UniProtKB/Swiss-Prot annotation:
Name by which UniProt lists this protein: WD repeat-containing protein 44
Keyword annotations: Cytoplasm, Endosome, Golgi apparatus, Membrane, Phosphoprotein, Repeat, WD repeat
Quaternary state and interactors: Interacts preferentially with the GTP-bound form of RAB11 when membrane-associated. Interacts with GRAF1/ARHGAP26 or GRAF2/ARHGAP10; the interaction connects the endoplasmic reticulum (ER) with the endosomal tubule. Interacts with VAPA (via MSP domain) or VAPB (via MSP domain); the interaction connects the ER with the endosomal tubule. Does not bind to other Rab and Rho small G proteins.
Listed Acidic residues bias regions: 462-471
Region (Binding activity): 1-163
Function: Downstream effector for Rab11 which regulates Rab11 intracellular membrane trafficking functions such as endocytic recycling, intracellular ciliogenesis and protein export. ATK1-mediated phosphorylation of WDR44 induces binding to Rab11 which activates endocytic recycling of transferrin receptor back to the plasma membrane. When bound to Rab11, prevents the formation of the ciliogenic Rab11-Rabin8/RAB3IP-RAB11FIP3 complex, therefore inhibiting preciliary trafficking and ciliogenesis.
Superkingdom in the source lineage: Eukaryota
Organism from which the protein derives: Rattus norvegicus (Rat)
Comp. bias intervals (Low complexity): 556-568
Post-translational modification: Phosphorylated by ATK1; the phosphorylation stabilizes its interaction with RAB11A and RAB11B.
One Gene Ontology term of the molecular function aspect: small GTPase binding
Modification Phosphothreonine occurs at: T151, T211, T263, T341, T396
Chain intervals for the UniProt region annotation (Disordered): 108-158, 202-273, 309-341, 391-418, 454-474, 552-587
Length: 908
């Protein structure tokens, strides 16, 4: 058989010496110098040689396959002729391969298997010699001299070319389907046995009927090299990681949490919503998707944690931060490390009188401040310590009151009253200083001091109600006064007191709220207890409701120890039952004893809020908000804050949410069923004290009032800043904003009523943020007094620091006043039934419920008798009144509570 002539780069080897091509030995240590100099050219030559050799081998293998197809189809004669022709035509250096393969296929068909096995064994031995493994590297280096005797390489280029040829042959052998390794690396690899082995391990040709495309097209496709099997000494491949589930699609705006709360005109542009918002809409909609109830119920209110901490954005605050905020600042120490006493701390804090500029230590402020006229509330004292300022009562005394008092005449002692007025100014309206003066001047001065006391406290010596020991008689008239220049007719000059609830509250009553139905009244204040009062005609209904949920003293599941003790103390103190005798008059609307008492707070209560289904929220100076229900005795949930909670409000349309404002400067919208903060925002500015909060426009906006006189509006859907109003006068001492004490919406007119510590009440139009009306006449310099509307929004009422209850008409009656400013209302009516600061005054939301059946029958007869009572009261805003009955409630600094009824023919 003729030897095969190999095609190489840079020349061809002699035909008679194929051994130099087959057996190669890598002399890396000896040829380092040559390789270093020719490294880059050799790499380029390797790439070119590899490409050309691969193309030659692929082309020849395709020709072999074509010849085999032709030989199967043709006869024996044609087969021999084609083999001879293909052998004689040799266009390239590998032209002898098809002829040799064809001859070997016919002549040595019987001995192919044996020869191929021998060839494979010899090839494996030669391959191990030429390509030693990593484990046999040392052995290959030891036998380097023996290999050099068998192989001679003339130059570095020939060595590289031979190496490339060997690698290409190895790649061709790997492509075999059986996986046998065939490496023609020796001179025997060029023998006829190797050709037979290559022919045997060549890829099997598929049947003709399975080959849809022509041979020409198939010959142009290069076979894909098979991937060699992984080494056995390596671990199995790591399985692919589990596929992460696709994120859920973003919810539409209609599916957000507060979409149900939106009004048609509450459309916040998307551009105005920052991407780094305090709480995204997806976070805000986590709970509402699960909630399908339109309002709060007992099941959702009692589920979950009983104590909820303020966690904004769903992140729990740091433990150290919470501990420091809850425990408050540590007691200051001296330079030597000793803790300062209370007296030293008070002496170190300086308070500045904004009117006179005088600075005094806080330890002496009690003597300087007017304790007799305007006792400071605990909240006011706390804010004063933080802001280091106070406002004297003299500066904020109403001008109208001074004018009125100057015109008052006393037939028995007009000259004495003039002297006492001068003495008041000299003494600074301080009874304590007057007593010191009385000790010096004897009995005569004592008599003057008593007169001063009567004048300062607006008490009458002949009035039996001035005595603390005697009870207030029912249906008795009260002291009435009106603004200077207001000549009448008056609306409340015939008002009478019908019930006195003094004796229950121990200390001041800071807040009172009627339920939406008007049958329940909640009052709370300095004694840390919430008291619920029920109307006589509604007592049985609520008592049956309580008995339904508290049969045999049963309380809610998993109550806290505090709740159990609260229930026990509530029962021991004897809450009124249906069988109790009520000694009061039949005209009294409420029972004389509370329906129930809620205990749990550890400091003064500041605000209350009712839901439409008899849930009650209470906020306190103990930095908590507690949730109650009229059918339960214990606290349902406690919401903890960072600082004093000054204001709370249920959402008007979805009482699963409520708003809370705190002195820490944060406004929070709580989700009661989920027991978490749904949305929150923080006030900007130097003074971040929130002193009032409420909803307006039926829940469209949340409004807060600050200590520096700002009303800030936030859209409820995202609790984002909307706008603000700076509540202050344009000139005078009130041009600096004062503390906002109350915010009340005026439904149907897009207006809000703002009460502030500058002794002014303002009505703002939310359409253009303009001032619609300013009311003045009362005194509110440092208290938490707030004004509120009547049930039909015709009147507004407020307590005062001068012990009077002040009432204004919401709008001027043009039939009474001809030339008045439409944006000023100085025409007030005042009633007096208290001997201390009136801390709270409200109208009853449903006056008809306050009257018994007998009184209502008398009312019908009275309407027929007094037809003037049905005269329509047409005001400038179109408010029409069909009933002039009004019921008021007021409370003072001593805990006394009085009920008033305005209707002349009901109580003669």
């Amino acid at each position: 058989m003729m030897p095969l002539k190999m095609c190489t780069w840079g020349g061809s080897y002699p035909v008679g010496s194929p051994g130099k091509v087959g057996l190669l030995s890598f002399k890396e240590t000896k040829n380092t110098g040559n390789k270093a100099g020719n490294e880059s050219p050799v790499q380029e030559l390797r790439q070119d040689v590899s490409k050309k050799i691969i193309e030659c081998i692929i082309e020849e293998s395709q020709k072999v396959l074509q010849l085999e197809d032709d030989s199967l189809d043709s006869k024996g004669k044609g087969l021999s002729d084609q083999a001879t022709a293909s052998h004689s035509v040799a266009g390239t250096e590998f032209s002898n391969i098809p002829g040799l393969l064809a001859i070997q296929h016919e002549l040595q068909q019987g001995s192919r298997k044996a020869d191929s096995q021998n060839a494979a064994e010899e090839t494996e031995l030669e391959t191990q010699k030429c390509f030693p493994s990593d484990n046999n590297c040392e052995k290959s280096e030891k036998t380097e001299d023996e290999t050099n005797n068998l192989t001679e390489v003339s130059s570095a280029d020939q060595l590289d070319a031979s190496k490339l040829e060997t690698e290409i042959l190895n790649k061709e052998a790997v492509e075999v389907k059986e996986g046998d390794v065939v490496n023609p690396a020796s001179s025997d690899a060029l023998s006829t046995k190797d050709f037979a082995a290559v022919e045997e391990v060549a890829p099997a040709k598929p049947p003709r009927h399975l080959t849809p495309e022509p041979d020409i097209v198939a010959s142009t496709k290069k076979p894909v090299p098979a991937r060699p099997p992984p080494p056995t000494n390596f671990p199995p491949p790591r399985p692919p990681p589990p596929s992460r589930p696709a994120p859920p699609p973003r919810k539409k705006k209609s599916d957000l949490e507060f979409e149900a709360l939106k009004t048609p005109d509450l459309d916040v542009p998307k551009d105005n919503i920052a991407s780094d918002s305090l709480l995204t809409t997806n976070m805000a909609s986590e709970s509402t998707v699960r909630d399908s109830l339109p309002s709060l119920d007992l099941a959702s209110a009692t589920s979950g944690d009983k104590i909820v901490t303020a966690q904004e954005n769903g992140k729990a605050p740091d433990v150290q931060t919470v501990a420091g905020e809850v425990m408050g600042p540590q007691r200051p120490r001296s330079n030597s490390g000793r803790e300062l006493t209370d007296e030293e701390i008070l002496a170190s804090v300086m308070i500045k009188n904004l009117d006179t500029g005088e600075e005094i230590p806080l330890s002496l402020a009690e003597e300087k401040l007017p304790t007799g006229i305007n006792p400071l509330t605990p909240l006011t004292l706390h804010i004063m310590r933080r802001t280091k300022e106070y406002v004297s009562n003299d500066a904020t005394q109403s001008d109208d009151e001074e004018k009125l008092q100057s015109q008052q005449t006393d037939t028995d002692g007009g000259r004495l009253k003039q002297k006492t007025t001068q003495l008041k100014k000299f003494l600074g309206k301080s009874v304590k200083r007057a007593k010191h003066l009385a000790e010096e001047y004897g009995e005569r001065a004592i008599n003057k001091v008593k007169s001063v006391r009567d004048e300062v406290f607006h008490t009458d010596q002949d009035d039996p109600s001035s005595s603390d020991d005697e009870g207030m008689p029912y249906t008795r008239p009260v002291k009435f006064k009106a603004a200077h220049g207001f000549k009448g007719p008056y609306d409340f000059d015939q008002i009478k007191v019908v019930q006195d609830l003094s004796g229950e509250h121990m200390g001041a009553v800071w807040t009172m709220k009627f339920s939406h139905c008007g049958r329940l009244l909640a009052s709370a204040g300095q004694d840390n207890i919430v008291r619920i009062w029920a109307l006589k005609n509604a007592f049985d209904y609520f008592n049956n409701m309580r008995m339904k949920y508290n049969t045999e003293g049963r309380v809610s599941p998993s109550p806290s120890q505090e709740s159990l003790s609260s229930s026990k103390s509530d029962t021991d103190m004897g809450v009124c039952s249906g069988t109790d005798e009520d000694p009061d008059d039949k005209n009294a609307p409420f029972r004389q004893r509370p329906f129930c008492k809620y205990k749990g707070h550890t400091a003064d209560l500041l605000d209350l809020s009712w839901s439409k289904n008899y849930f009650l929220l209470s906020s306190s100076m103990d930095k908590t908000v507690r949730l109650w229900h009229i059918s339960r005795r214990e606290c349902l949930c406690c919401f903890q804050h960072i600082d004093f909670v000054t204001a709370i409000a249920f959402h008007p349309r979805d009482d699963r949410y409520f708003l809370s404002g705190s002195l820490d400067g944060k406004l929070r919208l709580w989700n009661i069923p989920d027991k978490k903060v749904a949305l929150w925002n923080e006030v900007d500015g130097q003074t971040k004290l929130i002193t009032a909060a409420n909803f307006c426009q039926n829940g469209k906006y949340a409004v807060i009032g600050t200590y520096d006189g700002r009303c800030i509006f936030y859209d409820t859907e995202h609790l984002k800043y909307h706008t603000q109003i700076h509540v202050r006068s344009t000139r005078g001492r009130n041009k600096v904003g004062r503390k906002i004490t109350g915010i009340e919406p005026l439904p149907g007119e897009n207006k809000i009523l703002v009460t502030s510590n500058d002794s002014r009440i303002r009505l703002y139009d939310l359409r253009d943020l303009s001032l619609s009306m300013k009311y003045k006449g009362y005194v509110n310099s440092s208290s938490q007094i707030k004004a509120s509307f009547s049930h039909d929004f015709t009147y507004l009422v407020s307590g005062s620091e001068d012990k009077y209850v002040y009432i204004w008409s919401t709008y001027h009656d043009l039939s009474k006043f001809t030339s008045v400013r439409r944006d000023r209302n100085d025409f007030w009516e005042g009633i007096k039934a208290h001997n201390a600061v009136v801390t709270s005054a409200i109208f009853a939301p449903n006056p008809s419920l306050m009257l018994s059946l007998d009184v209502q029958s008398e009312k019908l007869e009275g309407i027929d008798k007094y037809e003037d009572a049905e005269v329509l009261d047409n005001t400038s805003t179109g408010i029409v009144k069909t009933d002039n009955t009004e019921v008021l409630l007021s409370a003072d600094f001593t805990g006394a509570q009085c009920f008033y009824v305005k209707n002349s023919f009901l109580y003669p």
